[in-house]
Amino acid sequence: MNIEKLRVSGLEAAIRGMRNPYDSWEKSDSYFGLDSFDGIDNYWIPKMLNIYLGDKGVPGLTEENCSAWIRSNGIIYEDCDLCEFAFIGPNDMDLAQRLISGGSEHRKFLRQINVSFDLTLPFYVWKEFDTYKVGTTANSCSTMHTLKNNPITLDCFELGDFENIPFPKEYQRPDAKSNCDEDFIQMCLIPYLESLRLRYKETGDKKYWKELVRWLPEGWLQKRTITLNYEVIYNFCHQRKNHRLAEWHTIVNFIREHLPYASEFIFLDELKAEVEEVEEDSFLSELFVVLSKLGELKDGLYEYTHKDKKNKRK
């Protein structure tokens, strides 16, 4: 499988539109536009750094990682020396995350953030991906043209976690003239499919094409250009992140690592859990310091020394 040519658009309209119900456009602190790499590094990142470090900002964000976070999320496309940027400020981030936490009826702005990429998957994953029809458009490569013009080899199939399981002799027909138990896929299946392709190409007889399509395995790779939005991505990432198919894990991890503000918008629940864990650890550390000043630790418990202060009369 493969994911390439990622593009993200619509962030400016989405952030602007999410403030419409509140008539609060003056509170927006995000910036969008085009600039050079020098402009990004020398003007925009310092500007956003000052905004975030002087405000509440994103939970868990520190001075050490703030600059890297702003750059990695804010640059949404690079073209030679120019960058398209979308730097979302803390006010807009706070509102966006509250809307996301409020549910699908409140996070409508996610539907206005558009994403497109080329995705190559085997048929057995496309069948599940096609579940997400609403808000998704796809143009696929023609299976007919691909089969006709290109030789069928092992590389035409998904091999990411391929295990060449032998074809046991006890399951083969007793009158079989050849032994395919060592490598059934390469010795029998793929040569048979390639022979059907060649005979169809030579004769034009559709019976060969029909049999080729009939017996083509589900692991056959097909490329599609996909257009969808953050809401669709939000749904399938939460529904498929623990799926038994490894390909879904690859897709979810790609989204997590490459989409702008994926942690803050799509995986917000995980981000909150991490922040709560850090805050809990910090609280326990501070509590330990306080308790250690009050008493001595004995057998896993703190023993306190109580000193009565008696009022002395003169």
Question: What label would you give each PLM region?
Answer:
Residues 1-314:
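Family-specific signature for flavin-dependent thymidylate synthase
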